[in-house]
């Protein structure tokens, strides 16, 4: 009958198992860290902490460039450790326990619990919480095994070289990233929408935002001053296209300010042609980003839109283009609408709008039962005694905030934002 291991041998076995378990834990944690880290997060850490010249930084950068070889190093190390631990335990238990079945069962149980709990689950969980620290603290240890297994890692680098390049980031990836940042509260929904609009800014064509020609107010070169004045005053805009009476082509734009400045000079004859700004021509298939650049180059606020046959089909203003980024723009002379749409989930509403009309149409069907209750009364019916200018009202369906006119404190409107998880 074989005797149990001596005290010295038992100590050596325990030390060997602990050492191997530590190695397995380190490489397992590093596997999670190198898989979880993003290039921008690592670059930000290096620049913020001025770690560009550190050895650990160079090692991590090398691992990111040779990702497959790094993972193979970790997998080889883990498998070797698992084999060694299992065999050491088997030899120790085989000498101590007579029954081979019990010995094998204990070997399986101890090595399984040890490797799974202490060398896999625990280190990987901790690595998810401390990604940067794991990458920095254990970089040299993992690099040692990387060099130790160099023939295998080199072969892996050659085989997987064409797969090392990360796939390009798509707009959809960026949208998901923005949504995730919004959910974490790093910036507001409006900020996210502005960034998303910026991403698709170069894809929007002039044809999608232009004012069609049948809606454009214009005048002719030969029109009397009175007619031009009436069109300006009736339309309440600052610029107007001027057409040639013979060809019906746009010859330029006249500015309201120039018109009335000229009329004030009663001692000089009124000559419309002297007040014209040259017309900037853009195609209806031109991206608005390019159209904006062209208008800025010519210092023009309006541009004439033409189709592929060079026929005038509309106009586009710089304001129309900017609204694609920031949403609808209202000035002091715009008529205040009862419900103004700021974005897909946000509205600016007057207090006297019927609550049933607004909430049942835009927030949630059948949310308000009373057909005669106004927005103001409906918001005041909640438990916090209504809405004032110092706080917001938050419900399961929407968030409402009172917006007070700084020049007229009695004039209040409500900014109402629908929550993203509300289903109509």
Curated annotation (Swiss-Prot):
Chief location of this protein within or outside the cell: membrane
UniProt KW keywords: CBS domain, Cell membrane, Membrane, Repeat, Transmembrane, Transmembrane helix
Domain CBS as annotated: residue spans: 210-270, 275-335
Organism in which the protein naturally occurs: Mycoplasma pneumoniae (strain ATCC 29342 / M129 / Subtype 1) (Mycoplasmoides pneumoniae)
Similarity comment text for this entry: Belongs to the UPF0053 family.
The CNNM transmembrane domain, residue ranges: 6-191
Listed name of the protein: UPF0053 protein MG146 homolog
Subcellular location, record wording: Cell membrane
Record-level GO cellular component terms: plasma membrane
Transmembrane segments: 7-27, 71-91, 101-121, 135-155
InterPro entries documented for this protein: CBS_dom, CBS_dom_sf, CNNM, Ion_transp-like_CBS
Bilayer topology annotation: Multi-pass membrane protein
SUPFAM superfamilies, per database record: CBS-domain pair
């Amino acid at each position: 009958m074989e005797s149990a291991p001596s005290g010295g041998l038992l100590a050596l076995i325990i030390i060997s198992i602990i050492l191997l378990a530590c190695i397995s834990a380190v490489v397992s944690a590093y596997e999670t860290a190198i898989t979880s880290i993003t290039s921008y997060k690592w670059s930000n850490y290096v620049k913020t902490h001025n770690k560009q010249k550190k050895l650990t930084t160079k090692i991590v950068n090398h691992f990111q460039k040779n990702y497959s070889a790094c993972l193979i190093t970790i997998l080889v190390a883990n498998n070797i450790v698992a084999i060694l631990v299992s065999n050491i335990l088997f030899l120790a238990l085989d000498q101590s326990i007579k029954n081979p079945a019990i010995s094998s069962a204990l070997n399986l149980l101890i090595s399984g619990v040890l490797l799974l709990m202490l060398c896999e689950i625990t280190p990987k969980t901790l690595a998810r919480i401390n990604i940067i620290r794991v990458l920095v603290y254990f970089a040299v240890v993992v690099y040692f095994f990387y060099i130790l297994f160099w023939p295998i890692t080199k072969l892996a680098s050659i085989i997987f070289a064409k797969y090392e390049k990360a796939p390009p980031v798509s707009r959809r990836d960026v949208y998901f990233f923005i949504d995730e940042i919004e959910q974490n509260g790093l910036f507001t929904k409006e900020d996210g929408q502005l960034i998303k609009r910026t991403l698709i800014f170069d894809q929007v064509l002039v044809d999608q935002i232009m004012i069609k020609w049948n809606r454009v107010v214009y005048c002719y070169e030969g029109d009397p001053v009175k007619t031009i004045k009436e069109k300006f005053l009736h339309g309440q805009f600052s610029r107007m296209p001027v057409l040639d009476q013979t060809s019906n082509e746009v010859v330029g734009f006249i500015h309201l300010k120039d018109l009335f400045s000229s009329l004030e000079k009663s001692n000089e004859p009124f000559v419309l042609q002297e007040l014209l700004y040259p017309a900037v021509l853009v195609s209806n298939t031109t991206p608005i980003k390019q159209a904006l650049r062209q208008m800025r180059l010519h210092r023009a606020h309006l541009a004439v839109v033409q189709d592929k046959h060079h026929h005038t089909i509309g106009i586009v203003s710089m304001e129309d283009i900017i609204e694609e980024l920031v949403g609808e723009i209202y000035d002091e002379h715009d008529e205040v609408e009862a419900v103004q749409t700021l974005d897909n989930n946000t509205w600016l509403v007057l207090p006297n709008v019927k609550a049933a009309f607004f909430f049942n149409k835009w927030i949630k069907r059948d949310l308000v039962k009373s057909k005669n209750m106004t927005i103001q009364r409906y918001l005041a019916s909640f438990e916090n005694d209504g809405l004032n200018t110092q706080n917001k009202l938050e419900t399961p369906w929407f968030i409402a905030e009172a917006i007070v006119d700084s020049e007229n404190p009695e004039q209040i409107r409500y900014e109402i934002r629908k929550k993203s998880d509300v289903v109509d």
